[in-house]
Amino acid sequence: MTEFQDPFLKSGEPVKFDKKYIDSTIRPGDIGIADQWAVKPVSDPFVGNLETPVNSGYFTKAFINNLPFYRSGISPNFRGLEVGAAFGYLLYGPFAMTGPLRNTDFALTAGLLSTIGAVHILTALFVLYTAPGKDPNVQPSDCTVENPPTDLFTRTGWTDFTSGFWLGGCGGAVFAWLLCGTLHLDTIMPIVKGVWAAG
């Protein structure tokens, strides 16, 4: 037994920690001791978020900071609208081309309905992210994203993002459905369906 351990073992009182080790922004009744002592990303140097030529290069920083999630000067609702439109538009193709009704006349409509269903599931997950009553986790600044959007990481901002995502996702799916349903693409669809059905 070392000299450091001996006083703690002999005394019957609980060990008191120094105030500098306790996060004073969190009320003790809100969370348990495990959350209070949890390792926080980026601020801890042992996490491994290091500045490398890949994550701190000009191209990477310009690309990441121009994504709708990190772009400055837009509202959370518009962020969600852009992200949702991309998801809805890109999810439509796999559902329409590889779905169980791909060789029928209802392939395009089944793809649309499947995509809208997937957007609804993703929207429900966004809603559940803040359902327990806590605000979303605020992303700290790092070497790639120096100014993360602070208005997005509030309950109101996340709710606006979620509603924009739902509207954009459904709109992107309908837009892709309209594009695939036009006459000039109708001749290409059997070729694409034949490629996927060959396997």
UniProtKB/Swiss-Prot annotation:
Main location: membrane
Entry-linked InterPro entries: PSI_PsaL, PSI_PsaL_sf, PSI_suXI
Membrane-crossing segments per the record: 81-101, 108-128, 165-185
Domain of life, source organism: Bacteria
Keyword terms of this UniProt record: Membrane, Photosynthesis, Photosystem I, Thylakoid, Transmembrane, Transmembrane helix
Pfam families for the chain: PsaL (PF02605)
GO biological-process terms attached to the record: photosynthesis
Compartment annotation: Cellular thylakoid membrane
Membrane topology of the entry: Multi-pass membrane protein
GO cellular component terms, A-Z: photosystem I reaction center; plasma membrane-derived thylakoid membrane
Entries under Gene3D superfamilies matching the protein: Photosystem I PsaL, reaction centre subunit XI
Family membership noted in the UniProt record: Belongs to the PsaL family.
Protein name: Photosystem I reaction center subunit XI
